[in-house]
């Protein structure tokens, strides 16, 4: 088959959305029209719910992709837990998600190596592909449990994940171990630290990739668009959730570049987008997924993505754009970007560096946020409300291991010593 003669033009501005029977979906579609969104990744309980929703969206000129959880169960979780407890993912300690919890109760990931699991997923995808009018399939939770959570989530669970720990390191189902030993001649558990074994990590990534590409084959056989919502970059995702999505046969990708989960600075979006331009599958059109911000940061984030190679935006979710002023600005923004895309032959041309800068000290926004946090700590210790002025000395590196870089710096004004730790997954300052 020859190369495509023309690039398919996908909707440019998207939202993810949960759909439930009885909701006023028509009014949401009207709001999407009003602010310039033309694509929706819809999560509905059954194929019949999509059959009800699609005509409403199409009336408003909005394309609909079925937003489907794959390796993690959703609507059929309790049924499968009861009928097939042997299907569930196992961690390095030998604990199965069939009878243990990782972070939250709804994390019930399946083992991708099992033929029965693959067949179950394939039949599920087929059932949604048979929905007339559905434009595409967007897979989510297509991965293992997070061996490392984004840094801002650690306090919520009372944890520090400065390296890979056994309780959150999944992929040790007996069938996974059997297949790996068959291919490589050893059991990864025999090593002092299996997390350092690149072959074992890549093997788990490849199992997830095989299932993704099986899904893509089904989706394409129905003439529909194949999409996914993975972690921020292939390198980060491979480390954090075993999701090497640059190898997936996607038509369009919506990486979840949620800066508030990581550094809190829009430079995270710029860096990830630069890395994604480099590492995505050549056949895949790159978009950027981001959290909704009801203020100026929304537009700074979209600029960071579109100026560095993304071809469009997905917002989680439209409900986060609340103020009339932000909605007006969003509409003006979408109109202006579409004009630029049309003038450039259907693509957003961007000038961006070859690689992201992994030096945290060169990221002004990250350093500013960190110094504000230091000022808050000093003021609180002194019983004051006003932020304290800083006189920081030199940052001294005190430790470095895996993706972790540890520094100390002294504030001469308060004589406070701060421990500062940066995390770098892939080529991106991640937290």
Where do the PLM segments sit?
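Aromatic-lined carbohydrate-recognition surfaces of secreted/lumenal glycan-active proteins
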Residues: 138, 201-239, 284-293
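Substrate-binding cleft/loops of secretory-pathway carbohydrate-active enzymes
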Residues: 225-263
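The substrate-binding groove and active-site-proximal loops of carbohydrate-active enzymes
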Residues: 16, 37-44, 103-119, 197-207, ...
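Substrate-binding cleft of secreted/luminal carbohydrate-active enzymes
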Residues: 255-266, 287-353
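Boundary/entry segment of secreted carbohydrate-active catalytic domains
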Residues: 2-26
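Short, acidic/polar
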Residues: 18-32, 118-127, 235-246, 295-304
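Catalytic domains of carbohydrate-active enzymes, especially glycoside hydrolases
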Residues: 22-46, 132
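Active-site-adjacent "subsite" loops/lids of carbohydrate-active enzymes
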Residues: 66, 70-127
């Amino acid at each position: 088959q020859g190369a495509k003669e023309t690039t398919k033009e996908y909707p440019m501005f998207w939202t993810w959305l949960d759909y439930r029977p009885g909701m006023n979906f028509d009014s949401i579609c009207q709001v999407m029209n009003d602010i310039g969104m033309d694509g929706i990744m819809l999560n509905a309980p059954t194929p019949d719910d999509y059959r009800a929703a699609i005509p409403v969206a199409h009336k408003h000129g909005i394309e609909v992709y079925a937003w489907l959880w794959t390796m993690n169960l959703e609507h059929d979780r309790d049924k499968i837990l009861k009928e097939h407890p042997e299907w569930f993912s196992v961690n390095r300690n030998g604990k199965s998600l069939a009878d243990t919890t990782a972070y939250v109760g709804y994390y019930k990931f399946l083992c991708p190596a099992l033929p029965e699991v693959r067949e179950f997923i394939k039949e599920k995808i087929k059932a949604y592909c048979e929905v007339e009018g559905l434009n595409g399939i967007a897979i989510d939770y297509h991965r293992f449990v997070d061996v490392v959570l984004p840094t801002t989530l650690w306090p919520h669970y009372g944890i520090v994940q400065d390296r890979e720990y056994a309780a959150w390191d999944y992929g040790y189902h007996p069938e996974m171990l059997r297949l790996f030993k068959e291919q490589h001649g050893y059991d990864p558990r025999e090593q002092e630290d299996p997390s350092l074994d690149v072959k074992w990590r890549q093997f788990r990534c490849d199992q997830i990739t095989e299932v993704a590409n099986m899904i893509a084959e089904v989706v394409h056989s129905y003439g529909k668009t194949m999409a996914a919502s993975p972690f921020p970059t292939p390198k980060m995702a491979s480390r954090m959730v075993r999701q090497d999505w640059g190898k997936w046969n996607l038509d369009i990708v919506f990486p979840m570049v949620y800066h508030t989960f990581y550094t809190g600075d829009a430079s995270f979006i710029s860096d990830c987008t630069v890395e994604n331009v480099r590492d995505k599958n050549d056949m895949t059109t790159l978009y950027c997924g981001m959290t909704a911000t009801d203020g100026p940061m929304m537009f700074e984030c979209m600029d960071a993505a579109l100026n560095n190679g993304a071809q469009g935006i997905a917002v989680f979710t439209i409900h986060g754009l609340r103020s009339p002023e932000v909605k007006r600005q969003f509409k003006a923004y979408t109109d202006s970007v579409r004009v630029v895309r049309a003038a450039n032959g259907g693509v957003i041309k961007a000038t961006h560096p070859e690689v992201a800068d992994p030096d945290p000290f060169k990221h002004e926004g990250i350093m500013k946020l960190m110094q504000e946090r230091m000022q808050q700590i000093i003021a609180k210790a002194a019983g004051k409300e006003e932020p304290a002025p800083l006189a920081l000395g030199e940052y001294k590196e005190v430790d470095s291991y895996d993706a972790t870089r540890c520094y100390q710096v002294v504030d001469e004004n308060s004589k406070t010593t701060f421990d500062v730790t940066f995390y770098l997954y892939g080529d991106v300052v991640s937290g």
